[in-house]
């Protein structure tokens, strides 16, 4: 057991912090051999783990459309924000630009920014899409009920949870519909290139995407609820496969 821990420590020295953090959180009740197997699995697949909220992948399987029918564009009056919040908005916009999440826009559409205080008292950047959502044709794709997901776990003894980092930002919006996501700041006007939080049909599109990607595995070896995935197995060997 001591030898395994020492070897693991040496092998982990060259790994980035976000990967060693995963290793540190492996459950304590794994056997030494199971732990070695889990560590090796994480190391082999380390490029799949995101370093931050802005270290994103991008799928080409779907593109989100925003069907507003014949409704004309609207432009909301610029909302005033407390002076202390303006640097937060500026920083978030700069980070989204750098991550290719948004781009500058000249659009007849414009929704307002809102900052929502999270439990840790930090501020979440959001766009108020309620007016746009009221004009949008709704997607009826079903989202699984959490209680149905839990019942499907059955006799599973091994569970792994995966949370897609900024999952919505990994699916693109159709170029012709991006103007509809426009928002305005003191620095200028921007639009989303990828799925934005708060859009009416974002959950339906993302659930459909995940069900497509994991077709043949859902309800058999994994459960998917939007950007949360549970992998479940009765044995450890099945689990690492």
Feature map (PLM): residue ranges:
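Polymerase palm active-site segment centered on the conserved acidic dipeptide of motif C
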Residues: 161, 234-241
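Reverse-transcribing Pol proteins
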Residues: 13-141, 220-237
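Intrinsically disordered, low-complexity serine/threonine-rich segments
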Residues: 1, 5-12
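Reverse-transcriptase-like RNA-dependent polymerase core
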Residues: 10-14, 47-74, 116-124, 141, ...
């Amino acid at each position: 057991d001591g030898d395994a821990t020492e070897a693991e420590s040496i092998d982990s020295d060259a790994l980035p912090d976000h990967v060693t953090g995963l290793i540190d959180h492996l459950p304590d009740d794994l056997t030494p051999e199971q732990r070695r197997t889990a560590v090796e699995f994480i190391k082999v697949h380390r490029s799949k783990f995101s370093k931050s909220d802005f270290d994103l992948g991008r799928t080409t399987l779907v593109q989100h459309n925003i069907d507003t029918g014949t409704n004309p564009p609207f432009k909301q009056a610029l909302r005033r924000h407390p002076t202390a919040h303006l640097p937060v908005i500026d920083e978030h916009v700069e980070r989204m630009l750098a991550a290719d999440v948004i781009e500058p826009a000249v659009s007849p559409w414009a929704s307002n920014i809102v900052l929502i205080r999270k439990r840790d008292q930090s501020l979440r950047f959001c766009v108020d899409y309620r007016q746009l959502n009221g004009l949008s044709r709704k997607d009826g794709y079903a989202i699984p009920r959490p209680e149905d997901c839990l019942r499907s776990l059955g006799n599973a003894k091994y569970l792994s949870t995966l949370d897609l980092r900024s999952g919505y930002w990994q699916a693109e919006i159709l170029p012709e519909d991006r103007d509809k996501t426009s928002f305005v700041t003191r620095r200028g006007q921007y639009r989303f290139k990828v799925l934005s939080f708060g859009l009416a049909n974002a959950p339906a599109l993302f659930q459909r995407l995940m069900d497509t990607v994991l077709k043949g595995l859902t309800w058999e070896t994994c459960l998917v609820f939007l950007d949360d995935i549970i992998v479940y197995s009765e044995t450890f060997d099945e689990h690492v496969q």
